[in-house]
Amino acid sequence: MLEIHDNDISILKDKKCLILFYFTATWCGPCQKIKPMIKKLSDGLDADKCEVYMVDIDENDELALELKVKAVPTFYLFYEKKLIDSCSGADILKVHKLIKDNLPKLEKEIIID
């Protein structure tokens, strides 16, 4: 899992894979609870197909405002610079489904423990 700093989302420019933004905060209990599960999910993904970026809303407040993040944890999925799907809450199965449902149909199923 990578991190976004200084409200910089230039990584969206040239990516040809799914990009998952995990909006979080250090003071958010549910965010801290799901963080290791998101890390494990991220580690199990093929980086050519999907990359996961953690975005601390306190460090990246302009970005959170621009993208209208209203709660944490929130997950935004981008493809070719466009927001294509999202979900909120500390539910790893929801996040897994968000990614799986948006991978190309030929993609093998992502398996999480």
Feature map (PLM): residue ranges:
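Short hydrophobic/charged patches on amphipathic alpha-helices used for structural packing
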Residues: I9-S10, D61-A64
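Chalcogenol-based redox active-site neighborhoods
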Residues: E66-L67, I84
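Short active-site neighborhood of thiol/selenol oxidoreductases, capturing the structured segment around
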Residues: D14-T24
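N-terminal "domain-start" segment that seeds a small globular fold
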Residues: M1-I11
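Non-catalytic, surface beta->alpha helical segment in thiol-disulfide oxidoreductase systems
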Residues: L77-I110
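Thiol-based oxidoreductase modules, predominantly thioredoxin-like and allied folds used
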Residues: E3-I4, F23, K35-I38, S42, ...
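Short cysteine clusters
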Residues: C28-C31
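Structural micro-motif
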Residues: L67-Y76
